[in-house]
Amino acid sequence: MSIIVTGAAGFIGSNLLQALNQRGETDIIAVDDLTDGEQFRNLADADIADYLDQNDFIERYARGDFGPVRALFHQGACASTLESNGRYMMENNYRYSCRLLEASLELGVPFLYASSAAVYGAGRTFREARRYERPLNVYGYSKFLFDQRVRRALPQARSQVVGLRYFNVYGPREGHKGRMASVAYHCYQQLRRDGRVVLFGEHDGFPAGGHLRDFVAVEDVARVNLHFLDHPQRSGIFNLGSGRARSFNEVALAVINSVRASADQPPLVLAQALESGLLGYREFPEALRARYQSHTCADLELLREAGYRDDFLSLEEGVGGYCRWLARSA
């Protein structure tokens, strides 16, 4: 039976392909939009059975052309929180997802999809309940609205439906995302290019570099997806973060100290990084002030109740491994 991955050439989709391959799974149909031809690089080292454009795929999938399908991992979306074209966002993220959900329910195919912590907006409670969901941008709204569609469908669903609300994911194969790549990625590139890291200054009551996010390694994200593949009786919407909020300063330090370790140099603390000029700040961008999440931290209670017991990589472990991967890939 085939496994289908949409967004397969993207960041999380391509890492999911790698995780499936490591299990010996190769009967995989990869689905994406390769208008940006450079993204083929995320597919080049994956073993797959076929590739389809996302527009060609959806009609064939709805007709049942692929025979028995073990699961559909729907990772494809426009992930830019800065995208202002609401019509494009809703068609690509909401309407396309609705069509896949409807077809999956009709075919009885387990449907595991990417939601986002962006649904929570500027709130301080990150629990999978409607009263805590107040998105700040149209990207967050597109994910929020699809989650509501799923909630209405779940009571009648006869096959698995799982939504995973990704928090701040970082790791290999995200370079194509440009401005939307992770803080860790941008810190590493700044350090290599400019010899220093520059973070946003104070905003929303948080000091310079002190904004807090739940940073989660993409390896952990892939593992949680596979957990639900292995437990098709589990359905619902679940947070997927590390369960810990860490500051941008801590990410920058993890990058700086990883690079220093590769040069056999001792680690620095924050004050030393600032004093040496390896870390600095710039004024917080005016354009982001009204739509910026200053703090996120996943409540993992429902995920743990769904049977996922593994520990998540610490920020230092995950960022350290990522920096070594970036160095090898340069």
Curated annotation (Swiss-Prot):
<keyword id="KW-0413">Isomerase</keyword>
<dbReference type="GO" id="GO:0005975">
    <property type="term" value="P:carbohydrate metabolic process"/>
</dbReference>
<feature type="binding site">
    <location>
        <begin position="11"/>
        <end position="12"/>
    </location>
    <ligand>
        <name>NADP(+)</name>
    </ligand>
</feature>
<dbReference type="GO" id="GO:0008712">
    <property type="term" value="F:ADP-glyceromanno-heptose 6-epimerase activity"/>
</dbReference>
<feature type="active site" description="Proton acceptor">
    <location>
        <position position="177"/>
    </location>
</feature>
<feature type="binding site">
    <location>
        <begin position="200"/>
        <end position="203"/>
    </location>
    <ligand>
        <name>substrate</name>
    </ligand>
</feature>
<feature type="binding site">
    <location>
        <position position="54"/>
    </location>
    <ligand>
        <name>NADP(+)</name>
    </ligand>
</feature>
<feature type="binding site">
    <location>
        <position position="39"/>
    </location>
    <ligand>
        <name>NADP(+)</name>
    </ligand>
</feature>
<dbReference type="GO" id="GO:0097171">
    <property type="term" value="P:ADP-L-glycero-beta-D-manno-heptose biosynthetic process"/>
</dbReference>
<feature type="binding site">
    <location>
        <position position="143"/>
    </location>
    <ligand>
        <name>NADP(+)</name>
    </ligand>
</feature>
<dbReference type="InterPro" id="IPR001509">
    <property type="entry name" value="Epimerase_deHydtase"/>
</dbReference>
<feature type="binding site">
    <location>
        <position position="92"/>
    </location>
    <ligand>
        <name>NADP(+)</name>
    </ligand>
</feature>
<feature type="binding site">
    <location>
        <begin position="32"/>
        <end position="33"/>
    </location>
    <ligand>
        <name>NADP(+)</name>
    </ligand>
</feature>
<feature type="binding site">
    <location>
        <position position="292"/>
    </location>
    <ligand>
        <name>substrate</name>
    </ligand>
</feature>
<keyword id="KW-0119">Carbohydrate metabolism</keyword>
<feature type="binding site">
    <location>
        <position position="179"/>
    </location>
    <ligand>
        <name>substrate</name>
    </ligand>
</feature>
<feature type="binding site">
    <location>
        <begin position="75"/>
        <end position="79"/>
    </location>
    <ligand>
        <name>NADP(+)</name>
    </ligand>
</feature>
<dbReference type="Pfam" id="PF01370">
    <property type="entry name" value="Epimerase"/>
</dbReference>
<feature type="binding site">
    <location>
        <position position="168"/>
    </location>
    <ligand>
        <name>substrate</name>
    </ligand>
</feature>
<comment type="function">
    <text>Catalyzes the interconversion between ADP-D-glycero-beta-D-manno-heptose and ADP-L-glycero-beta-D-manno-heptose via an epimerization at carbon 6 of the heptose.</text>
</comment>
<dbReference type="InterPro" id="IPR011912">
    <property type="entry name" value="Heptose_epim"/>
</dbReference>
<feature type="binding site">
    <location>
        <position position="186"/>
    </location>
    <ligand>
        <name>substrate</name>
    </ligand>
</feature>
<feature type="binding site">
    <location>
        <position position="169"/>
    </location>
    <ligand>
        <name>NADP(+)</name>
    </ligand>
</feature>
<keyword id="KW-0521">NADP</keyword>
<comment type="subunit">
    <text>Homopentamer.</text>
</comment>
<feature type="binding site">
    <location>
        <position position="213"/>
    </location>
    <ligand>
        <name>substrate</name>
    </ligand>
</feature>
<dbReference type="GO" id="GO:0050661">
    <property type="term" value="F:NADP binding"/>
</dbReference>
<protein>
    <recommendedName>
        <fullName>ADP-L-glycero-D-manno-heptose-6-epimerase</fullName>
        <ecNumber>5.1.3.20</ecNumber>
    </recommendedName>
</protein>
<feature type="active site" description="Proton acceptor">
    <location>
        <position position="139"/>
    </location>
</feature>
<comment type="similarity">
    <text>Belongs to the NAD(P)-dependent epimerase/dehydratase family. HldD subfamily.</text>
</comment>
<feature type="binding site">
    <location>
        <position position="177"/>
    </location>
    <ligand>
        <name>NADP(+)</name>
    </ligand>
</feature>
<dbReference type="InterPro" id="IPR036291">
    <property type="entry name" value="NAD(P)-bd_dom_sf"/>
</dbReference>
<comment type="pathway">
    <text>Nucleotide-sugar biosynthesis; ADP-L-glycero-beta-D-manno-heptose biosynthesis; ADP-L-glycero-beta-D-manno-heptose from D-glycero-beta-D-manno-heptose 7-phosphate: step 4/4.</text>
</comment>
